[in-house]
Amino acid sequence: MIRLFLTNNKHEQKLIVGAFILIALYLSPLIVLGEYAHIRVHDNLDSNLAWYKVLATSGELAGGLDAVTPQIINGLPRNAFGSELTLIVWLYKFFPTMVAYTLSQAITRVVAFIGMYLLLTKHVVKKPALSFITVGTALAFALTPFWPSGMLSTLGMPLALWALLNIRNGERSWKNYLTLTLVPFYASIVLGFFFFLAAIGIFWLYDAIKKKALNITFLLGILYMGLMFLIVEYRLIYSFLFEQEPTSRDEYFHARLTFAHSLRLTFKNFVLGHNHVMTVHGLFVLAAIFLALIFIAKNKEWHSQRLFIWLFVINFILSAWYAFWFYRGWLPLTERFHFLDTFNFARFHFLRPLIIYVSFALALKILVEGSLKWTGTVKFLLIGQIMLLFLFNDEIIYHDKPTVKEFYAEDVFAEIKYHIGLPQEDYRVASIGLHPAISQYNGFYTLDTYNNFYSLSYKHNFRKIIEPELEKNNKIRTYFDEWGGRCYIFTDELGKHYMFKKTSNKKLKNLDLNLEPFVEMGGRYIFSAVPIENAAENHMQLDGEFTSKDTVWKIYLYKVII
């Protein structure tokens, strides 16, 4: 980071300062609005933020390998949450939710900018005269709408690659090894770096074959970073290698798409990307890349621009790999090798943000160096991409979703807790038309949940509750039986919808639940976002209605009478 401000290029210094100001501006809605901000719901408010709070208050943040969290599904394994060696869990331990969230966003985006800037200036676009490309591309990369709980899993790749390429080139600086040491403490191996290290390992092998020499220092750098991830992710490694109890992932089935569907998905992913690794590259970035390809073809510069060509090919291959991972032609292999279902190898496409933005910088460099008359176009593409990314700020994209305060509705659930009048650990609840993360965030002990893996026997027991509804609707039956990450009270009438606001006119008219298993599991109350007209037929009694001006929900509290 020190090097950023030691550059002798005054123009570059101004660009860097300007980039940090723009990053701060991008983060300003979180800073100014706090819990009144709009942020991503999917795989964020509906899960991770609640998990962090549950973990922080559970007393099991640093629990043993066999520890459980009683608040979720009568004892969700502690290992289902992130390791206590990951910095993000401590942010949520010591700070309020939105302070922790904002700090995490700031850390990730600043490191993303620094990493991409260092990578480009040292190994890709080395000319000081092109600093507007390196700084602009690094800024654009840092503003991408990444998956919040992914941390540096994708946005930290440029910094790690910078360090590893330095080591490959014989540079023994302590900064490289410090980078390889620290990044794993704010990233996830399964959400990016397993695939990154695998790719770098392949690159090392290619290097060794091409040069007919083993670069042992480079290999040791790769292995060292891998070892650091194994230490940080020790819970995950233990669960993967030593846990014998079947989990919900053992019923995960992914190979279902036809060849034609997979082919369409290839091009869709290539142009639009994926919601966990959003790059917003389909307009200005792709335009720059295709303009550079046309320039290369016209001037027959295939050899001199082979890095750019290789990145383009790899980018497309990764999109195809992602799409065809879900091709049903894999079925014979998945039946023979079960780990192909339980581990998501499609995530090699998580390398694409790194590849796309390095390609963007190279494309802009090719255009400028090809002809000075392209300079204006290059600046237009770069500024256009940055402006486009500002339009993808959460506060704009999710303006029609609940704010954090509205979503978790702490005042409403405090009133429900007071109304029930029992210690929360003495009874269990479940939700209908509402994410169970909301109840979990408010301290209720839930029989429903959204988690990556949990006991398969629990999934089967929970299924008994919703079996009559699953039989009515093949879509939700398949969703639950062949994935099951959302262990929810699914209903035929509501389908896969879990955010019914108080303005909704939706009612459940033909609900059919088997609540005897629910009671046997400790269930006493149902929190429903919609009224249930045939509650009595399901052995439920309306016990109260709760809402407030600060929430978007109206909670119908039903007591189970069996």
How does the language model describe each region?
Residues 1-31:
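Start-transfer (signal-anchor) and selected internal transmembrane alpha helices
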Residues 30-87, 152, 186-344, 348:
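Transmembrane catalytic cores of multi-pass membrane glycosyltransferases
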Residues 82-86, 91-114:
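Loop-to-helix entry region of an early transmembrane alpha helix in multi-pass inner-membrane enzymes
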Residues 113-123, 129-209, 220-236:
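Membrane-embedded helix bundles of polyisoprenyl
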Residues 364-394:
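Signature aromatic-anchored transmembrane alpha helix within multi-pass, membrane-resident enzymes
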Residues 383-454:
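Extracytoplasmic
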Residues 388-389, 434-505:
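Extracytoplasmic/lumenal acceptor-recognition loop(s) of multi-pass membrane glycoenzymes
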Residues 509-562:
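Aromatic/acidic, Gly/Pro-rich catalytic loop(s) in extracytoplasmic/lumenal soluble domains
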